[in-house]
């Protein structure tokens, strides 16, 4: 798949295309031709073809497509779902509608919609947001009952093209015909469940229209993942493959430190040193022999204190990545510890969980960093980092991560069912999310994997995206022919070597 565009980027391209001799009217004609071709390929002379038409330019695409279908001898009918078209282009298309095309109003034809052989959604375009209005819900309920082929024009109505949010009654397409580039929201949950197969069709927009558009969003797929895997020379030794120093764990949160360590070691890092509370050392060292341990000073509740910073920074001199936060806890002392490590560490830092929470009160310390910093927030942590609500983040998760990355010069791995790896103007979209990972410990594994890839030499953006791809794909593998309900973090860790073998040997 090529580049993905935001709604704003696509709108810019449509208007910029005029500089290269393609008008908005011509773009509508080109889109309609592509839509009509897909409709015709799924129809026969006897097919009952019903196009659901909105008032805007999405409806205009459908009206022009109806004319083209009529020219081919097919018998399309159009249903005006929101009244007559009201944009310049859609009104002009309506005025040119062939007299052989049957025109109906939605309120009288719900049974007609249900009985369509090919049902085409041209109601709402990329400007849709919020919920479907009550007065149009009967149309969408009729669409639900239709057993014919369902095709969406540009995106299914009811889907938000900016963030992937979707009304529960959104048009559920078998095929979505989208134009020039895929729109971001089509590839995000829950919208992806309404899109069916996504066909990206050329409508004559010159790629030079995109030259000034940032961020550049591309999917992170198996080809990119294999290319990003750190090279392992045959004569390599443990020092060749890097060392992670991890500041993690506390008396209250022992498991997080162990899960992140095991995930890192299962993904190829040569050495892993865990700097943690003595109680964590005593617990984990009895069964996890592969890493080394350093007991740190703690307060009376078993959380690490800031005076450990000097010791940890000394250890960083012989390491290639510093991981901070898994099970660390959040106190005034961890805030000081995290700030001092960020300000003084000269190796790349991966900051997760309570590392992020401890950073938030002193976030401007990121401006004093001496090395690369990767933040791995889930939506609530991203909201804290940005000083906004979770709702504001979820309405524009990419924008939130992008602005954070730009402001502080950091790499942001914005976790969710679909994950964005953001580094300045470059964004990877990772879509391997699964409910297998909707359990405690998943974030700890991800942080460990990302730190492992950084320690082995990956740049920050590749390490973040590859980490997300690795965890999601391994979780899918661990859950193969097993219930996602019953998979736990250790099952995923145990499956990592198999996933990496498959990736290394992928065609």
Where are the predicted features?
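Small-residue (G/A/S/T)-rich helix-start motifs and N-terminal tracts that mark the onset
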Residues: 1-80, 186-348, 357-374, 379-507
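Nucleotide and nucleotide-moiety/phosphate-recognizing core
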Residues: 36-122, 131-153, 345, 403
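Short beta-alpha junction loops
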Residues: 82-85, 156-157, 279, 355
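Short acidic-hydrophobic sequence patches enriched in Asp/Glu that either
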Residues: 89, 135, 169-172, 276, ...
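Small/polar-residue-rich loop-to-helix segments that shape phosphate-bearing ligand pockets
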Residues: 94, 117-124, 317-326
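Internal gly/pro-rich beta-alpha loop/helix module
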Residues: 117-118, 123-215
